[in-house]
Amino acid sequence: MGTIGRRARELAVPVVVCALTLGVYCLYSVGQWRMMASPSWDLAIFTEAAKSYSQGHWPIVPIKGPGFNLLGDHFHPILVLLGPVYRVFPSGLTLLIVQNALLAWSAWPVTRAASRLAGSAGGFVIGLACGLGWGLQGAVGAQFHEIAFAVPMLAHGGVAFAQGRYRACMAWLAPLVLVKEDLGLTIMVAGLVLAWRRRDQGRRALAESLAFAAFGAVAFVITTQVLLPALNPAGTWAYSLDGSATGAGSSAGGAAAAKVWPSLIEILTFPSVKIATVLVCVLGAGVVGAASPWFALVVPTLAWRFMGSVDFYYGWSSWHYNAVLVPIASAALLDVLGRAARWRDRRSADEDRALADEAGAAAWRAERVSSWWGTGVISVGVATPLLALAATAPLLPMWQLTSSGFGQDGPRAEAAHQAMAAVPAGSAVETDITLMARMVPDHEVYWVGSAKDMDPLPEYVVVDQRSYVWGGRDVTAVGWATDAHPGHSYELVFERNGFQVAHRTS
């Protein structure tokens, strides 16, 4: 009974942290769904991919273009795992819940490891700072993306590194190549870090680590230079190394413009939000975690973002690009705390020696500074992530939960449902972002404009006149459709509260 009770106490803190994280994220996602919040078209795109996988097909995504294979956009075959779940729960909300579960899972190994090093209270603080970390909140706010699968892998792999379980570390990180093409570079850096850490463990350990680094590099080259071009309609990698689109992400294709590279100082500091992003990442590692070689794993992700020309790659408070940085920073902190705990624990052993003889007393005095240093490092490492999270909370997505109106059906909800009901199930429809993800389960959905080369054209056009995608222009469903598809005629079949549905009559 004693063993069972001890085991239960060990698991209590991680269970509470993961449950709290999952609960907060699901509360937010359901609220977003009810409010019809649509930060981008990405949720609809991934919902179409999950729908195709659930039917045993390639991830064909009409939103990107007729017959577009999403594996030619980014390389994320791990998304096939969404198929069975979507088959049971066919909704875009399903993907949001799956993502929340994956992100909450990442707090499990971090909390358990932190509790062993810093006690239950310290474990709770570090685990919560990881689970509700800045980058994970941004991912939840931006809705589903493939990197959700990478977060628990990086968390488990990083904790294994901090605990000296290096083969387990490699086993957890290897599947990252199935999540997104650039993560092969993260594996490469991890292999080099492992080689450095294991440099005194013999040739075999060194060879394993370097082989792992080579695996990551080769995987990156194969996915970007062979697999993605083979699957992309334009026959090329749709994104450059800096993450910016080349114009070849759809069947329309396009050539990348000549790139003028800025100086290293400009890459790192301009605009200044890049400095803030790095600072928040360091604070997430408790500051002291930046001393761990594991912290180097943030470099590939920050590099392609900072070298890019897309403004929202640079920030720290929104979007999903920072999600992979959170478990890396947390694991780096645990790595340093592990060493600090060993310094701290020397004191009790040396104190016993001091009681035995004068030589022991001298040794104890020599070690006491190291012990105090270890205790200080642990204190800073535990407190800093929590303080950083508290200080930045008002700027992060979950702060919206404090608003009294968050999660409530808006005044346009009824009109939105009526607009969707006006389109028969099974029909092909062109639409903007607002209702896109909601229409995927029962319709063949296209982005407004992606179906221009189709024959026949989609039967319906659904427009939200208040959607931000129209840039404030006065758009009507019939007007847009007749302009986009000359020679065809449309009639308005529904209009209410800014939502319009047009039916193609010829």
What are these regions (language model features)?
Residues 186-216:
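Perimembrane helix-loop-helix junctions
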Residues 93-117:
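Transmembrane-helix motifs of polytopic, lipid-linked glycan transferases
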Residues 296-355, 361-368:
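Hydrophobic/aromatic-rich transmembrane helices and adjacent perimembrane loops
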Residues 1-27, 166, 207-212:
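Start-transfer (signal-anchor) and selected internal transmembrane alpha helices
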Residues 27, 45-69, 77-78:
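Extracytosolic helix-loop segments that constitute the early lumenal/periplasmic catalytic or substrate-binding loops
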Residues 28, 38, 42, 52, ...:
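Membrane-lumen/periplasm interface segments of specific transmembrane helices
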Residues 109, 129, 148-172:
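Specific aromatic-rich, kink-prone transmembrane helix
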Residues 15-18, 121, 213-217, 341-396:
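Signature aromatic-anchored transmembrane alpha helix within multi-pass, membrane-resident enzymes
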